[in-house]
Amino acid sequence: MAIHSFRPLTPAGRFTSLNKREGLSKKRPQKALTEPKPKTGGRNVYGRITTRHIGGGHKQLYRIIDFKRDILDMPATVEALEYDPNRTSNLALVVYANGEKKYILAPEGLQVGAKIFASNKATTNDYNVGNNFPLHLIPPSTRVHAVELVPGRGAKIARAAGTGLELVAVEGDRATLKMPSGELRLVNAKCRATIGEVGNGDHNNQSLGKAGRRRWLGVRPTVRGMVMNPVDHPNGGGQGKSKGGGGRQQLVSPWGQLAKGFPTRRRSKQSNAQIIVHHNGRKPRGKK
């Protein structure tokens, strides 16, 4: 999709550039594949704010997406490409040979009318965009997206617009993936993945142009902790552009977590054992 800029008839229009959304269906989503999406305002069941900067925005329906791709060896036809307000990528509405309809993430290059399928066996001519296979059947150096972390639990990584992983190698029951961050990670070779990269790669090149468009998306303003009062934030108070006292020498989060130069990932996290090289090029502790 191309980026569309506007004539500067208003101050907001001068700075706005948006996706054209060419080729997307203008029909309403499939009713059987949607659910209500109630607003929370970032509050939990006790009414306390647990996630800041959430509130308002346009009403949205949640689209039920097939992340498992568990209908095997049955061809499906892409009926339409649709916009999804709940994520950065677009969706593809596919119709299987038995008439069942599903939403999947729309890969880059997938066209209306294309034939796709998922299978546990593959030949040389089957590695087309949108087809889904276990990692051990996919050739090395292939770009994939919507990859499972645990077999059968559905895709968990590489689901945002424009993202994709590189399948580096498959050795035994483990596959090595290169993440968009540069991290090298091991996953079970039985995990499923979809060929290609997620579409709508120009999403990051958009400029919303005005605060109101961000509010339409349900995002409220962000206030820096340094300009708050001491009662509202650990970095609040002080004279001018400086944080207050209280014995702190470093910037912290609203809950006191060090914000600069401090690794926030837990060392006890189980998936640490599956990381070969971190995104910064360093190997995990204890690995040579």
Swiss-Prot record:
Key words, A-Z: Ribonucleoprotein, Ribosomal protein, RNA-binding, rRNA-binding
One CC-aspect GO term: large ribosomal subunit
Bias kind Gly residues: ranges: 235-248
Domain of life of the organism encoding this protein: Bacteria
Repeat found in the keyword field: no
Region (Disordered): 1-46, 226-288
Regions of compositional bias (Basic residues) in chain numbering: 279-288
Entry GO MF terms: rRNA binding; structural constituent of ribosome; transferase activity
GO biological process: cytoplasmic translation
Claim: rRNA-binding is one of the keywords in the record: yes
Subunit structure: Part of the 50S ribosomal subunit. Forms a bridge to the 30S subunit in the 70S ribosome.
UniProt cross-references to PANTHER family, sorted A to Z: LARGE RIBOSOMAL SUBUNIT PROTEIN UL2M (PTHR13691:SF5), RIBOSOMAL PROTEIN L2 (PTHR13691)
Record's function text: One of the primary rRNA binding proteins. Required for association of the 30S and 50S subunits to form the 70S ribosome, for tRNA binding and peptide bond formation. It has been suggested to have peptidyltransferase activity; this is somewhat controversial. Makes several contacts with the 16S rRNA in the 70S ribosome.
UniProt family annotation: Belongs to the universal ribosomal protein uL2 family.
NCBIfam families: rplB_bact
Designated name of the protein: Large ribosomal subunit protein uL2
